């Protein structure tokens, strides 16, 4: 009898979370409309404005080797493959803008975070576009306006 109870407990801890995750993604897709489509994106220009207004946080979801090679100097770094274990580190009161060099991985992170109840977007022009947007005087002004990147 104890084995049956133990087996049922183990089963409930493995099957129920998977079913809940599937249900959350189903709900996200069922509610998907033109407003959601527009709201899930942020350009570099929009991101920088949101950060200056203290409404958003950049989430760099690249592999740690990529981040060690080059980084923005602000935002949070959680590799995409660590996001399921670390998403609770993210603030719930800010827009989370997920970013990678282009936008393939960041769109996955955005969808995942939305199923977890976060107001998440992905960076449409990627970190390469953000680097371009922060050239020269733009970088200086951003640092002065936000106090970031000491």
Spans of features found by a protein language model:
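Bacterial N-terminal signal peptides
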Residues: 7-15
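Short, surface-exposed ligand- or partner-binding patches at beta-edge/loop junctions that are enriched
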Residues: 98-100
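Rhodanese-like catalytic fold shared by cysteine-dependent sulfurtransferases
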Residues: 3, 18-45, 50, 68-95, ...
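Catalytic donor nucleotide-activated moiety binding site of glycosyltransferases and closely related
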Residues: 65
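Short hydrophobic beta-strand that contains or immediately precedes a catalytic carboxylate
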Residues: 47, 55-62, 78
